């Protein structure tokens, strides 16, 4: 693969990741998960002010895109960031927008 082809593939991958993150509530959820891995959907619903169904839809989209992972703990499902690139992007955004 040529250098240009590799760069194009990387750009497409980065654009897909940013697109999956590019909703204010999804960014808020990811910020919460970066500081508190293993947070329940109920807690994320409370923090974001979204309805349970809206929170669930955002979590499902991010899980389908490979951004987050879920783990069952008794009756709760706990969410964590799965993709290290997401952690790096969230850390950069926090440095720029939350000094």
UniProtKB/Swiss-Prot annotation:
DNA-binding residues = 41-64
PANTHER family annotated for this entry? ARSENICAL RESISTANCE OPERON REPRESSOR ARSR-RELATED
Q: Where is the HTH arsR-type domain?
A: 7-99
Pfam families, A to Z: HTH_5
Q: Which SUPFAM superfamilies does this UniProt record tie to the protein?
A: Winged helix' DNA-binding domain (SSF46785)
Q: What induces it?
A: Part of the ygaVP operon, which is repressed by YgaV. The operon can be induced by tributylin (TBT), a toxic chemical used as a biocide and in textiles and wood preservation.
Q: What's the source species' lineage?
A: Bacteria, Pseudomonadati, Pseudomonadota, Gammaproteobacteria, Enterobacterales
State what inhibits or activates this protein.
In the presence of H(2)S, two cysteine residues form an intramolecular tetrasulfide bond, which attenuates the binding of YgaV to DNA. Both unmodified YgaV and sulfide-modified YgaV can probably function as either a repressor or an activator. Binds heme, which may influence the DNA-binding affinity.
Q: Which SMART domains match?
A: HTH_ARSR
**InterPro entries, sorted:** ArsR-like_HTH, HTH_ArsR_DNA-bd_dom, Metal_resp_trans_reg, WH-like_DNA-bd_sf, WH_DNA-bd_sf
Tell me what this protein is called.
HTH-type transcriptional regulator YgaV
Which keywords belong to this entry? Activator, DNA-binding, Repressor, Stress response, Transcription, Transcription regulation
Query: What processes does the entry annotate via GO biological process terms?
Result: regulation of DNA-templated transcription
Q: How is loss of this gene reflected in the phenotype of the organism?
A: Disruption of the gene affects the expression of many anaerobic and ROS-scavenging genes. The mutant shows higher H(2)O(2) levels and increased antibiotic sensitivity. Loss of the gene induces drastic changes in gene expression profiles under oxygen-limiting and/or sulfide-enriched conditions.
An example of a GO molecular function for this protein is:
DNA-binding transcription factor activity
> Magnesium: present as a keyword of the record?
no
Q: What's its job?
A: Transcriptional regulator that regulates large-scale gene expression in response to sulfide. May act as a global regulator responsible for redox homeostasis. It functions as both a repressor and an activator. In the absence of sulfide compounds, it negatively regulates many anaerobic respiratory genes, including formate, fumarate, lactate, nitrate and nitrite reductase genes.
Q: Does the keyword Transcription apply?
A: yes
Primary gene name: ygaV
């Amino acid at each position: 693969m040529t250098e240009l082809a590799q760069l194009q593939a990387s750009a497409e991958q980065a654009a897909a990741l940013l697109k999956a993150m590019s909703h204010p509530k999804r960014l808020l959820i990811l910020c919460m998960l970066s500081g508190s891995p293993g947070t329940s959907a109920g807690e994320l619903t409370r923090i974001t002010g979204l309805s349970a169904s809206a929170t669930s839809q955002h979590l499902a989209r991010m899980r389908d895109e490979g951004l987050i992972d879920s783990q069952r703990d008794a009756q709760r499902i706990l969410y964590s960031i799965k993709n290290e690139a997401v952690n790096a992007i969230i850390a950069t955004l926090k440095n720029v927008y939350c000094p």
